[in-house]
Amino acid sequence: MSSGAIALGCKKMNYNKKNLKLDKSQAIASIGQIELMNLFLETFSKYKLDISQILLTLDDTEERRRSINAKRTFENLFDLDFIPIVNENDTIATSEIKYGDNDRLASRVAQITNADTLILLSDVDGLYTKNPKKFKDAQLIKLSLIHI
């Protein structure tokens, strides 16, 4: 799961992300997506690894027909020895742009691909009921190895 199309688009266009309305964010995402994929291509090609791009929305993973199509695409890419770079399709997504959360989409992609493991990297220490940086009432969820 990737992220950063809007941020890279803002950088290229010298825009402040906080001042963008939804429709402008979607346009900026399409500019930044090319920048993002170029960075991935440059990095992976150093190791002679082939990549592809898959742009999804949460709806794509939750509607049965589209979910099956996505699953088949992943399977075929794996068979072709390509590494799919997945990003939220911010050019058509709405709620995800507002909340900036790819975790649910990453979880759905892990389910679709029958992944053995999903590792979410974060700058937050722990698992919370909601984003503790935005919500003061966020509560830490205590886990034990039994839960994991």
Provide a role label for each language-model segment:
Residues 1-9, 51-53, 85-87, 120-122:
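Short beta-strand segments at enzyme active-site cores
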